[in-house]
Amino acid sequence: MLDGIGFEPRAVRVVSGGTATTVQDWPGRQRLWAVGVPPSGPMDDLSFRLGNRLVGNPEGTAGLEVVHTGPTLTFTSPARICLTGADFGATLDGAAVSRGVAVDVEAGQTLSLGRASGGGIRGYILIAGGLDIAPYLGSRSTFELGQFGGHAARRLLAGDTLHLGDGAMEPALPAAALPRLTNEWTLRVLYGPHGAPDFFTADDIDEIVAAEWQVHYNSNRTGVRLVGPKPRWARADGGEAGLHPSNIHDNPYAIGAVDFTGDMPVILGPDGPSLGGFVCPVTIAKAELWKVGQVKPGDKLRFHPIGFQQAQSLEQAQLGSLEAMAAISAVTTSGPIIQGSGVRKATHSAAAPSASRPDTPSVHSLSGVDMSGQGCGHGKECASPAPRPAAAAPG
């Protein structure tokens, strides 16, 4: 009698893991920076948080970060997902899947992500309810270098099984306008922490900011290396700290600090070191860090200096838009969100369908947030002050 009874867990089975698919959550591990534990978490936190909002997850819900080439996943039970970040040409049982909108997946369906195309290199798969993974040091984020967190403390491999969580969920939200990903970026930066003219003169800093930099192939979650003109230094060496002028006595680093390791700048990432002995003349504004998660080898970027108040306003605008999304009243509606053969419908929340295309969910834009990758440092997004820190400070 029991022979005919089968059990299928609420899970996702990994058919192939892709290049580097890991479990991450936001804001990652906090208050451990002083003992050398980085926060980890999604490199493009804006896309990650946006996806969680769209499927109705609270902040802190774990999802998947996909890099360069994506995984193939089979769902053993119904689920609701949202894809954000770079375009990986995702398909569900062969039908194209839109990004930036909640999608219902049926039991037995297979989600396949290919290679990232266009701008950006990281994508995110957010699942309603999250993933049933035990936190480590307060977070489910994977820290591969430290070999802890996430699923088995590593990137996903074929044969893995991820159990779905039972996290509290709100109704799904309308489709959102995703940040535009490009191959040419402008990153708004704050002057410092090492702004003393002993390291770089004002003219030296002007040259660094005016230069066009190219993303080096040896870039990852630890840091993004940049190739560009050799910097001029205000001194011949580092004195008692070292032979090169970039050498200083060990000091704490900030995530997003532009760290000159010799003559090569490195933008420190969420898996980077918490301290070191190199000069950091500028730091990426916290609201701009999502762009660092999307730059890929060969991309070009420039730095644009802004002030502390302006950086605060940028962060507050970003936070306010995400909070506004969470406060939208849920109105259940349906619309096809998978294009191609075998179109399926997913339940999502929207104020009203598009007038021009009644089958298209309405789009919610992150008002006041630089979604272009080309920050000019002026305009609507800089209008309102905020009491929050501007640069990513040690957690």
Model feature map: region roles:
Residues M1-R357, P361-G395:
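Conserved "landmark" site that anchors the functional core of diverse proteins
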